């Protein structure tokens, strides 16, 4: 370790000396350790309390004809951060602490950032020049080195409802032609390991495909032609380009996240994904956002009993649901599809008096949420 640190220090003082090819860094509590290799292709491995979590995991990003992560690293920097972060919308507490150690690999037109937290590790690519080339491919791998039980939400389509049941099986027992929606959980000895992403903007979401004792990221290429689906206001890509996004630009890419937890309940308490995400509109006003429980008519298909009217998509049903929400201290009623025309939010269903429902709900102290498909608000 001293030899590694000497090489790192020497690289700062004498730029002509080759930077360290193996870098080690730990979490603030020293339980998580990452080992980064920069020779030929950048890769990393992880351990917690001496237990191997991830074996050697190579990573790269193909921009135009260049493959980032395979060229010569020019410089390595480190820093430690511990600062209070106030939640945009308060929950059980108003703020948390963003505490991590960071290693940064600096290249000619990009850099790779690694952050090591007490509850996980993440890395991302950062474009430092306004690169006009398309991003053609990203290679993401989570290699465990041996088989472990995994929790996956499997699908065989890049566009779907994400409503499948979870499959609990060893990685090697999963069908290799399927892939899972993130996050995926893997049990490594006594630890719960969560594979996920964070800060996803203007980039395809990551699916995770099982391979031998591993998961690999796969991504939907940029849509070429889009067509309506089944006559509904859903749009599907019928053909795709040969790239992920048309222009790289000067930007940050999504974080590739490995959460490492001592038990399942720790996952619920973790703010790792939140801390890795960035607020895009710094001056935006979020004070109007009020957290709360919601009564959603879709869950019970508007089946209510012992009433003197016909239940369904109508004003009386929603007034009844508002009364129920007020009585049981439920902050919101969500009115699902049917309150407007399918393809026009401004054409209201005459059987659902939205202004009357909203006025009544306000008097009862209940908020109204109106469901819409994304194509109607773009």
For the regions a protein language model found, what residue spans apply to each?
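Charged interaction patches that mediate protein-protein contacts
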Residues: 10-11, 185, 364
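N-terminal accessory beta-strand-rich subdomains and adjacent acidic, glycine-rich linkers
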Residues: 22-281
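Compositionally biased regions
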Residues: 14-17, 28, 363
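Short, solvent-exposed loop/edge-beta patches enriched in aromatic
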Residues: 6, 16, 108, 119, ...
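Bacterial Sec-dependent N-terminal signal peptides
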Residues: 1-22
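Substrate-binding cleft of carbohydrate-active enzyme catalytic domains
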Residues: 288-378
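Short, cationic low-complexity segments
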Residues: 279-289
């Amino acid at each position: 370790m001293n030899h590694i640190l000497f090489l790192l220090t020497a690289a700062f003082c004498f730029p002509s000396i080759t930077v360290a090819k193996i870098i080690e860094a730990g979490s603030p509590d020293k339980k998580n350790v990452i080992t980064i290799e920069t020779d030929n292709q950048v890769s990393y491995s992880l351990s917690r309390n001496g237990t191997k979590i991830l074996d050697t995991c190579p990573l790269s990003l193909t921009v135009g004809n260049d493959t980032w992560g395979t060229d010569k690293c020019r410089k390595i920097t480190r820093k430690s951060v511990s600062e209070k972060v106030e939640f945009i919308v308060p929950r059980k507490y108003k703020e948390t602490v963003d505490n991590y150690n960071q290693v940064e690999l600096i290249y000619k037109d990009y850099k790779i950032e690694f952050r090591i937290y007490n509850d996980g590790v993440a890395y991302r690519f950062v474009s430092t020049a306004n690169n006009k080339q398309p991003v053609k491919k990203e290679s993401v791998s989570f290699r465990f080195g041996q088989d472990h039980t995994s929790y996956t939400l499997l699908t065989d389509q890049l566009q779907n409802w994400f409503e499948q049941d979870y499959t609990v099986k060893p990685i090697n027992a999963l069908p290799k032609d399927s892939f899972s929606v993130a996050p995926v959980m893997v049990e490594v000895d006594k630890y719960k390991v969560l594979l996920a992403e964070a800060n996803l903007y203007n980039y395809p979401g990551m699916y995770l495909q099982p391979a031998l004792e591993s998961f690999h990221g796969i991504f939907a290429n940029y849509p070429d032609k889009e067509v309506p689906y089944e006559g509904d206001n859903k749009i599907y890509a019928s053909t795709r380009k040969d790239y992920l996004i048309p222009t790289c630009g000067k930007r940050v890419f999504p974080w590739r996240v490995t959460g490492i937890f001592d038990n399942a309940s720790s996952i619920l308490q973790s703010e790792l994904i939140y801390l890795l995400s960035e607020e895009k509109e710094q001056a935006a006003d979020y004070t109007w956002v009020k957290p709360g429980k919601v009564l959603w008519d879709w869950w019970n298909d508007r089946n209510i009993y012992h009433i003197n009217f016909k239940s369904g998509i109508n004003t009386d049903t929603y007034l009844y649901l508002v009364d129920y929400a007020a009585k049981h201290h439920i902050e919101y009623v969500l009115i699902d599809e049917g309150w407007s025309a399918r393809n026009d939010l401004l054409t209201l269903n005459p059987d659902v008096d939205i202004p009357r429902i909203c006025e009544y709900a306000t008097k009862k102290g209940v908020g109204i949420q109106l469901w819409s498909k994304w194509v109607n608000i773009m």
